[in-house]
Design a protein with these regions (language model features):
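Bacterial N-terminal signal peptides
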Residues: 5-15
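N-terminal carbohydrate-binding accessory modules
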Residues: 21-86, 93-95
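Aromatic-rich peripheral "rim/lid" segments of glycoside hydrolase catalytic domains that contact
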Residues: 202-213, 408-497
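Polysaccharide-binding and catalytic clefts of secreted carbohydrate-active enzymes
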Residues: 54, 179-320
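Active-site clefts of carbohydrate-active enzymes
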Residues: 144-153, 263-278, 313, 350-392, ...
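Glycoside hydrolase catalytic-domain groove-lining segments
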Residues: 281-296, 300-375, 393-394
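Substrate-binding cleft of secreted/luminal carbohydrate-active enzymes
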Residues: 180-184, 189-190, 359, 373-428
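Aromatic-lined substrate-binding rim segments of carbohydrate-active enzymes
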Residues: 76-177, 288-301
Length: 497
């Protein structure tokens, strides 16, 4: 097994930080007091939301979203001689050394386990003994990248789905319910990002509980007036009963999703707004039912730990749908800082804090991947990643509505070859264990700065300025990468490294 000496340097920097002596065993600030309950929970103190440690001290979580994945196999081989236990323990220490004080994704990232490489039981055991705060995954739903060709979304209204959720929860929660290092539970990453597919998958199943439930919602929304529905959807049903019994489809087009995410305008056809509103109401029915089933299953075994729900794309749910799931979550968990759907109104409406659950800060891919495949979040250089990280660290840590952030990052360069997203996502270390020292050292400083910013929350106007600076910078990088890709596609003989 290779030794990674850079960690010793990083750890020394952290130990010498001005905050080190002020922290309790969990990483909470001993001079900012909340209620001592014996478990992580949330409180609003002097206008700022905090996590509160089991000892009753304020905590703000900084993590990386994807430290333990199945696409780290090369690093396990080259750095840890194939020893998964050494890799798991070493990864926790490397995260600590970089200034990450918790693991929001837990012992493994469910959406990046397609290869079945990670020994999940071993990972759970290592994390139980690691004494680092973490959130445990209860993956009741899949990310779209986990879906195999032809696989449909589950009918969440079926008895089969309820039994699956109850079984999954019963396998894990009873043994975790008294663990003080567990902050809570989450249900997986981004299942609602493809909401149109969810609606169409459930409606097309004839005689299914999901179809019956969703068509019933539509019948109530149109007050039983089938002609009104026909006018919106361009159909010719004689009655809602005919619609239900025929097996015929109401299909939701892709523009619904693209419009909600800010990528496309509202369609111009008559009835488009009504169709769009119908889609949001149906999605709300699906999401609320799913969260209620999962919440009730968890609370049968555990009354204390936090429930985060899914780590969802920030515009997946409108305000009304956030309100629908409010009773079943303790923390709001959008993935990104968003201009399309700012989360502040949700925090205010639910009177619950938020944390950013999978925040990208740019990825550096080999240029052949940028030109040949979809390489999400590409930026020219690792320096540009630091530019975005700095802007985000300021924006998020100075916002009193956030209790933490999970950066979309990996420890080691990913080595899977199926998709650019997986083969190209860069880590803080190469797959041979070589540190990217300027990146590592700078991120340590930024993570430390975030902890100092917590005592200096900004006003709404100041936060808007930071938010605008970040998004304007991100848009410029996107434009540069579009220009690069266009140039290279037009000039395939140009050589580059």
């Amino acid at each position: 097994m290779r030794t990674l000496p850079i960690f010793v340097i990083f750890a020394a920097l952290l130990v010498s930080s001005p905050h080190a002596a002020e922290l309790d065993v969990y990483g909470g600030f001993t001079d900012i007091k909340g209620e001592k309950t014996g478990f992580f929970h949330t409180e609003k103190i002097d206008g700022r939301w905090w996590l509160i440690t089991p000892e009753g001290n304020a905590f703000w979580g900084i993590g990386m979203a994807h430290p333990i994945t199945g696409f780290t196999q090369s690093a396990v081989t080259f750095v840890y001689d194939g020893d998964q236990q050494a890799w798991l323990k070493g990864s926790i220490e490397l995260m600590r050394g970089l200034g990450y004080n918790c693991v929001w994704s837990g012992p493994y990232c469910p959406e990046r386990l397609q290869s079945d490489f990670v020994d999940r039981s071993l990972a759970e055991e290592v994390f139980r003994e690691a004494k680092i705060p973490y959130v445990f995954p209860l993956p009741i739903l899949k990310h779209s990248v986990e879906m195999v060709p032809g696989e449909k979304r589950p009918d969440v209204f079926s008895d089969r789905f309820a039994a699956f959720v109850n079984k999954l929860v019963a396998e894990h929660v009873p043994r975790l319910k008294d663990d003080r290092w567990v902050m809570g539970y989450y249900y997986g990453f981004a299942p609602w990002m493809d909401d149109v597919t969810w609606l169409n998958d459930l409606i097309e199943r004839k005689d299914s509980p999901g179809r019956e439930r969703l068509l019933g919602v539509l019948e109530r929304r149109y007050e039983g007036n089938i002609e009104a529905l026909n006018a919106v959807y361009g159909t010719s049903f004689q009655s809602f009963e005919q619609l239900k019994q025929s097996g015929a489809l109401i299909v939701y087009p892709d523009w619904v999703k693209r419009h909600k995410m800010g990528y496309a305008p509202m369609a111009e056809a008559a009835g488009s707004q009504k169709l769009y509103d119908d889609a949001q109401a149906l999605l709300g029915e699906i999401v609320e039912h799913t969260y209620r089933i999962a919440h009730d299953a968890v609370r049968r075994h555990d009354q204390n730990h936090l429930i985060f729900g899914c780590y969802i794309k920030e515009a997946s749910l409108n305000l009304e749908n956030w309100k629908r799931i409010g009773p079943y979550i303790d923390v709001i968990a959008p993935q990104h800082v968003s201009q399309v759907f700012p989360i502040d109104p949700v925090v205010e409406a639910l009177d619950k804090p938020a944390f950013i659950s999978d925040q990208p800060f740019g990825n550096v891919y080999p240029l052949p991947l940028v030109t040949a495949k979809n390489a999400p979040g590409a930026v020219p250089d690792h320096l540009d990643r630091l530019v975005l990280y700095d802007l985000l660290a300021n924006r998020i840590s100075k916002d009193p509505n956030f209790i933490g952030v999970d950066f979309c990052a990996v420890l080691f360069d990913q080595s899977h070859e199926d998709k650019a997203y997986e083969i190209g996502q860069p880590g803080f270390y190469t797959k041979y264990g070589e540190p990217k020292q300027p990146l590592c050292e700078t991120v340590i400083g930024f993570n430390e700065q975030m902890l100092s910013h917590l005592r200096e929350p900004m006003s709404g106007e100041e936060l808007e300025l930071l938010d605008r600076q970040f998004h304007e910078t991100l848009d410029r990088y996107r434009a540069v990468m579009r220009d690069r890709k266009g140039f290279l596609l037009r000039n395939p003989r140009v050589s580059y490294r």
